[in-house]
Every structure is written in C-alpha cells, then in structure tokens.
C-alpha cells in the first residue's frame, strides 16, 4: 500500500468516529460533580462561536486526557458547520500541546483550515514547515486549482505528486481538469483523461463544471465529443444538455437533438 493510500485509509478511519460520545475521558476513576457541566459549556461556546481554548485548557489542567478521535470529530464537525475559525483554534491547540501523536491527515485538516481562514499565502507558509513524511499535497493542489492565477503552482504540485507516486485517485486529476477547463485547454483535458484510462482508474461520469468550459467553439466540442466516444467515457446528463444548448446557439439544430 502506497503512502497516499495509507493516509487516506487513516483519514477515513479517524473521521468515521462519532462525535456523539464524550469529548474527553477522565484519567482518574471519579469525576467531580462540579465538572459534569463542562461538555455542555463547550457546546454552548461552540454555538455562540466563542473561543473554546480556555475551556479545553481548564479541562486538561483538571486531569482529563484528550480523546484523539473525539477531538478530531469536534474539529471536523466545526468545519462542517462552517465554524472554521473555532475549528482552526482547536486544531492549533491540539498541535501546540502535543496531546497525542498527530497523523498526516491532522496536518492536512489544519492546512485546509489555514487556507480557508487566513488565505493561501499563510497555507503555503505552513506547508513548508510540515515534515516531508507528514505532507498531504492534495490539499495544496486543491487550493492552487481554484484561482486560475496559480496555474503554474498547480502544475508544479501535480508534477511533484506524480513523482512521489501520490496520483492514485481520480479526484486529483479532476481538480486539474476543472482548472484546464476554465483556461479553455482542451488538449490538457484530453491528456489527463487519457492518463486516467491508461492507469486503469475509474473515470465515471464527467461533471459538467469540469468540462463545459472547454467548449470554446463547435469544432472543439466536436473533437471532444468524438474523443470521449472513442475512449468509452460516459458523460453526465447535465453535460449532454450543455452540449446540446451550445449546438443550438450555433445553429446546429440537428446535432442539438
């Protein structure tokens, strides 16, 4: 099993943990009644988008050990609720105090939060400080493929991932396909789709957002349609509808049907 597969497997294992259990476990046998309400106070502070760091510090100083799965679950749930700032606070606290051994996916989760809250420049700074064996390039690639202005960095990151043997999932190719679609780079879209097929990866249905932008003109669309048919790639219904509309706008009524 390659490094990227190990990371992804570990991420799924950790993030599958339920957040319905207790967030912390007591290192002693008894729990003082005065502390029984602390979990509810944490929940209240989260709902009010207040900093939870003082409560985490208090809980830890009173002799409670952090449950890794549940703290990770807390961070994930905060992110799912788009409470990214509080999630980043909890993630940084987790790293600062080394409350348990961190995994590459912990770094990836924090990198995503840094990019979301503080921006791409800060995310790049953080990435440079992550030990090589703990780096997850997929987060960085995703960040680079969103703004067109970072195409050079996206291509460099994609190349690095290929050299390291990390390009094991179709979604990594899809990120670049989407980027090249925005740039009207039909040649690169075809090249990446060919690599997916060559590597025996499941292409599946192509999302309309990933390919519709390459239809700069009817000739390009005809070429793409022929190539897709030859390779046996299934187009999503929305993509077929988008192509039909493009034919209709160009006056090719028969082809639009």
From Swiss-Prot:
PPR repeats lie at residues 133-168, 169-203. GO terms for molecular function: mRNA binding. Pfam families: PPR. The keyword tRNA-binding does not apply. Keywords: Repeat. Belongs to the PPR family. P subfamily. This is Putative pentatricopeptide repeat-containing protein At1g43010.
């Amino acid at each position: 099993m390659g490094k990227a597969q190990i990371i992804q497997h570990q991420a799924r294992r950790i993030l599958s943990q339920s957040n319905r259990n207790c967030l912390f476990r007591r290192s002693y046998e008894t729990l003082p009644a005065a502390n029984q309400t602390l979990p509810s106070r944490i929940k209240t502070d989260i709902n009010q988008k207040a900093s939870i760091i003082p409560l985490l510090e208090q809980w830890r100083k009173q002799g409670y050990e952090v449950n890794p799965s549940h703290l990770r679950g807390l961070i994930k749930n905060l992110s799912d609720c788009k409470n990214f700032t509080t999630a980043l606070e909890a993630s940084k606290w987790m790293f600062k105090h080394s409350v348990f051994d961190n995994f590459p996916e912990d770094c990836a989760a924090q990198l995503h939060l840094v990019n979301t809250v503080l921006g791409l420049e800060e995310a790049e700074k953080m990435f440079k400080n992550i030990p090589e064996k703990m780096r997850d390039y997929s987060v960085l690639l995703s960040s680079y493929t969103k703004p067109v202005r970072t195409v050079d960095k996206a291509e460099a990151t994609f190349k690095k991932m290929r050299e390291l043997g990390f390009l094991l999932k179709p979604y990594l190719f899809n990120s670049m396909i989407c980027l090249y679609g925005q740039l009207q780079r039909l040649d690169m879209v075809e090249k990446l789709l060919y690599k997916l097929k060559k590597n025996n990866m499941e292409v599946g249905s192509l999302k309309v957002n990933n390919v519709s932008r390459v239809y700069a003109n009817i000739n390009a669309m005809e070429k793409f349609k022929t190539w897709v048919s030859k390779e046996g790639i299934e187009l999503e219904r929305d993509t077929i509808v988008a192509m039909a509309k493009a034919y209709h706008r160009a006056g090719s009524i028969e082809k639009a049907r």
